[in-house]
Each structure stands twice: as C-alpha cells, then as structure tokens.
Amino acid sequence: DIQMTQSPDYLSASVGETVTITCRASENIYSYLAWYQQKQGKSPQLLVYDAKTLVEGVPSRFSGSGSGTQFSLKINSLQPEDFGSYYCQHHYGIPFTFGSGTKLEIKR
C-alpha cells in the first residue's frame, strides 16, 4: 500500500496568516492527490483533487500544488472558518490511503 506522510501534525496560526501543509507519498502518485477539511463531529469535505483543482465553491485562498511524491496545501489569509483538521489522500490505487492529518487551531 502507498503510505502518506503528512506534516505538521499540529499548527497554530492567527486569522490573516498564511499556512502550508505538506504531504509526501511513499511512491509516485503523479497528481492523484486530494485534500479534505474536517470539522469536529462532521464528515470530511473535499477541497482539492488532482493535486491542484479546487472543488467548486471552495475559496480561492486555498491552493494545492505538487506532483509525484511531494504535495502541499496552502491557505492564504486564514479565516475563522478555516480552522479544523486537514487530511491528504491519494487516489492512485486502492486502497486510497489518508495522511495522519494536521490540526489547525487558532493562536491565542
């Protein structure tokens, strides 16, 4: 199975800041990479697929990049609704494994 290594595990940032989350695949997955946001008690919501394609309705402050084994999700000008957990997932071959997640919290 393809292993997905996500970092950091935890991120504390302020509204208005820019953050970047990274994901590394254990082998080449080309651009078959998705990013999800999950709020506590809710199902994950797809943000990005094919490494860089934003789902309709997702704000343009989100951007995905990368290919092969190295990927990133950048969030510009963080908004209060952006805080939660983020996961990468490859969709190259079954099983579609997830990264371990990044918890993004408001810096106090």
Curated annotation (Swiss-Prot):
Region of interest called Framework-3, as start-end residue ranges on this chain: 57-88
Annotated keywords: Adaptive immunity, Disulfide bond, Immunity, Immunoglobulin
Region (Complementarity-determining-2): 50-56
Signal peptide, first to last residue: none
Disulfide bonds, paired cysteine numbers: 23-88
Region of interest called Framework-4, as start-end residue ranges on this chain: 98-108
Gene Ontology CC annotations of this record: immunoglobulin complex
Region spans: Framework-2: 35-49
Region annotation (Complementarity-determining-3) ranges: 89-97
Region Framework-1: start-end pairs: 1-23
GO biological process: adaptive immune response; immune response
Disulfide bond keyword on record: yes
Record keyword Disulfide bond present: yes
Ranges for region Complementarity-determining-1: 24-34
Other comment: This chain was isolated from a myeloma protein.
PANTHER family: IMMUNOGLOBULIN LIGHT CHAIN
Name of the featured protein: Ig kappa chain V-V region MOPC 149
Organism this protein belongs to: Mus musculus
